Amino acid sequence: VYGLEPILETMLNVSIVIPAWNEQERINDCLLNATRQTVMPHEVIVVDNRSTDSTVAVVEQFMKDHPEAPVKLLHQDDEQGLIPTRDYGLNHATGDILGRFDADCMIRPDWVEVVSGIFTEDPDAMGATGPVMYYDLPSRHFGLRGDNSTRKRIYRADDGQPLLFGSNMALRATAWREIADEVCQDKADVMHEDIDISLHLLGKDLKTVYCPRMIAGISARRMDTSPASFLNYMRRFKNTFNAHPQHYRKHKPEILITALYPVMHLLYPVWQKVLNTADINPAEAAWINEQMELA
């Protein structure tokens, strides 16, 4: 099982790359979770992309308050967009393994340890992903089990190779360098950039793996978008595979996700009011029990 071997001096180190655009609400919690780990990451790189809110100030304050944390702040101001910002961070990272997730993601306290273990134990693994827990929905851990059972079965391409999920993914640095100049820049912004990375890896016969113990908490805020916006987002699955006709898939995750949308669209704002009334920060509380065990 991936990630179960004891941590040794030979374990590969892990850089974390977090693209950020106007993420003042969640970036501090994201950094707390990224640095409250059983194994400290080699570095945590926040790449700001022309934020107009206080994202930069929040990150700078975090670095001041936590000088021992290996957090770095970079700026990608040449071009607005997730892909150039992501690429800038990955290209500047210096670790053996490059973790990448969004600024509203709260990784489990053993995430770095598990990710390091995956790639250390399997030298053929070039990309890795795992399930997610929706921290701002009720029954979070039940949702995690559901996500795991579904994602490991249907989030795949070609002959069953796992597709990486942008909210919870890692690449071997050598693998990234092999595809960095080839990944789609998607100027029209119509594709899923994480699936695009996955397909470029598979196109070079580079192995991707799925690890149930590689867990990240993410927001379900996508369910709060308008029906038109949501359906447009779902079309990105098809658009990405259409851009890579040499690859195929047996399952279409967007069908299941779209089926869940009506109920989740109604539930999400109601649950946010419950959390606000109770003065609960769901991102801060995502892994509080696990973090207490580290204290």
Model regions: which residues?
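Short, well-formed alpha-helical segments that are part of the catalytic scaffolds
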Residues: E23-R36
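Short, flexible, basic/aromatic active-site loop/helix in glycosyltransferases
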Residues: G130-P131, F142-P162
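Acidic donor-binding loop at a coil-to-helix junction in glycosyltransferase catalytic cores
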Residues: A188-I197
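Terminal low-complexity segments of carbohydrate-biosynthetic enzymes
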Residues: N242-A295
